[in-house]
UniProtKB/Swiss-Prot annotation:
The modification Phosphoserine is found at residue 411. Residues 172-200, 273-283 have a biased composition (Low complexity). It is found in: Cytoplasm; Cell membrane. InterPro entries: CNKSR, PH-like_dom_sf, PH_domain. Residues 41-140 form the PH domain. GO terms for cellular component: cytoplasm; plasma membrane. Residues 151-162 have a biased composition (Acidic residues). It comes from the Eukaryota. GO terms for biological process: oxygen transport; response to oxidative stress. Keywords: Cell membrane, Cytoplasm, Membrane, Phosphoprotein. This is Interactor protein for cytohesin exchange factors 1. Pfam families: PH. Residues 201-214, 427-437 have a biased composition (Polar residues). The lineage of its organism: Eukaryota, Metazoa, Chordata, Craniata, Vertebrata.
Amino acid sequence: MTSYMAIDGSALVPLRQKPRRKTQGFLTMSRRRISCKDLGHADCQGWLYKKKEKGSFLSNKWKKFWVILKGSSLYWYSNQMAEKADGFVNLPDFTVERASECKKKHAFKISHPQIKTFYFAAENVQEMNVWLNKLGSAVIHQESTTKDEECYSESEQEDPEIAAETPPPPHASQTQSLTAQQASSSSPSLSGTSYSFSSLENTVKTPSSFPSSLSKERQSLPDTVNSLSAAEDEGQPITFAVQVHSPVPSEAGIHKALENSFVTSESGFLNSLSSDDTSSLSSNHDHLTVPDKPAGSKIMDKEETKVSEDDEMEKLYKSLEQASLSPLGDRRPSTKKELRKSFVKRCKNPSINEKLHKIRTLNSTLKCKEHDLAMINQLLDDPKLTARKYREWKVMNTLLIQDIYQQQRASPAPDDTDDTPQELKKSPSSPSVENSI
């Protein structure tokens, strides 16, 4: 049961209340905690591919799910016997249309401009059209959800159990009351203001999460109640700052309200304090902590830096691959595929392309001639060369013999003015060479 405190007989302020911990619009528990059997008769069901949010570089970006449409709710399960849904979408808050930006065929999306976009894909065009019609009718005919009802839920972020907040330890309130009594006995002129400043300091020192700040403020309120009675007995004026929060305030509204309460209470304190007290109070303000950056923004920054690092590593690997270098910087031997690619590469200048092509053909011709010459030298250097071996070699290298004969016929006849003997000038014909061997 919640107790209330009346201040100046005008407003009722709750002293202790269980905070509402909201995660993606949960009211009591997640609607994904329902099995396929418990859903009963479905309006439409079947296997669909769902695009992953954080797909790795080489893994598959689409995963197959058993999807069930029940009224205005869309559930997807890992299999037909699953006890809990992997995801849930409340369709009246979303729009359904084809996803032309996806490379996968038969894809459609369920999107919301301010919440999220889900991508699904069917096996064929017929299934995609059936799902689009069913989802479109569910979006149009059903009424929009209330603000307290969840819009979507997924299994990537586990649902926290909604448990009652544990009360603060008793020794904390005792120590705060003891310090308050010591301060009232030592400096009676600052009794009321010290208590209000302690509650204000607890209000300003708010961490990034909202429920913890609520608990701190509620812990300080009972201490201020105890201080009110002591201050009234002494007849001192009391300055008390009360901040009433809405059930679900925005983060900007929290900071704005804190700043306003801090400014108003500070002006009241400075008017009632002397110069020495104001100097000490300003020194205390210097030590006030500033709320940290929200946890969500930190996670987004980490993800962005990670993506940029992955992109840099990918670029570095591709540049090493293009330069035929190993990750350690060593020269990597070229493969046949890379050599073939390098041969196909062409320059924009046609004259240079012709010259390069001619050089490549001459190099290949030179290699062939060197190979033929090595075969002929191997035959002539054989000390055990016989007619039978020559005939076998001739049958095996018929093309080489024909090439030699053609070159001899195409070569110009030697002049008579040479000093070579007459019998050497006449080249022997092929039949005579064969007969002599």
